[in-house]
Amino acid sequence: MARAERAVQRLGGARMHDLALVSRFLLRSEAIASSFIEGIAPNPKNIALAELSESDEPVLGLSEAAQQVARNMTIVRTATQALASVDQLTPGDLEELQIALVQERPDLQGVRIQQNWVGGSSYHPLEAAHVPPPAALLDDLMRDLTDYLSGAAHSPIIQAALAHAQFETIHPFPDGNGRVGRALIHTVLTRRGLTPDAVLPVSLILATRRDEYVAGLTAFRFEGEPDSPEGVAGINRWVTVFADAVGHAAEQALVLERELTQLRNEWQSMLEEGRRRAGRVRAPRRTSAVLMVLEGLPGTPILTPATVVRMHGTSLSGAASALSELAEYGILSTVSIGRGNRAYMSPDVLNLITVRERALASPAFDTAVSPPSWKVPALPPEGR
């Protein structure tokens, strides 16, 4: 626990803004919407194009998987921020999130009214890995959980661990329990001020170390007196697994922060050299469109002039000029989005996100040491 807390505290001196901007891409796996796209890994470029299509410009040729992932990233990000800001969470708040996540399946929306189970046969729970409580108990269990989420009886990491495990144990919905349960981790850490922008990829670590995760949850679900030595040991085992994941997530976030800082330094050098060669002697003003685009690039690696206008309030001509200038210097490249339209993208950011996600999927956090343990995008080609 102390190691995890120290690792998170070290993030306080990092460029948290950058980490917040790219966190939604690292948490891409949490946005997988339904079983028909489970196991498909849309790459960061396709997801960024899908986000662009949602907000600024229609993009042709997008896969349904990329669009679904982009939509659910927006849903989870918005819901987490909303849940983190309310004084008292209610079961209805969690139900609203679940309904938004399974909007394409009205028959699976809301609190379940039938028994469900995890693992084993689809027809009976005899070989299930876990059988959640009966539907008749859900109202009381969910009120108890949201009351706990609204308080501060334990430290943030312990609270996030217990809330996540209890929610996964209750399994209150017909579908979407995993995604809601993972969102609760970020909700707690944000509510308690530990990670103001929900940047820690905790659930990716738990997914990578799935055997430890499942063993920890199983220990937490000890059937017997909760205050017995066995019950306490089970809770402690789960909290240890979770705290270890938080510590690793914070350490990997620091690695990403250092890599982003290196990228920014490279961009600054490329900008200065490009302007020198173009005879632009004066440095751009801090409020110039060029610098504003560079500032937001980690979070918006694919953009159009309309994106720049929406984000930074520049003129359309100023936005177009800034993007063209950055492309001229090799910081951005262009990508077709259909019908003669083009967008600008940062290969550096997209490649970095892919490399980091692959590393997070490796039990050793290094694919040269151990391969990814779940489906991830292909390694980007060498070079810029």
Kindly give the residue locations of the regions a language model identified.
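FIC/Doc superfamily catalytic core
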Residues: M1-R384
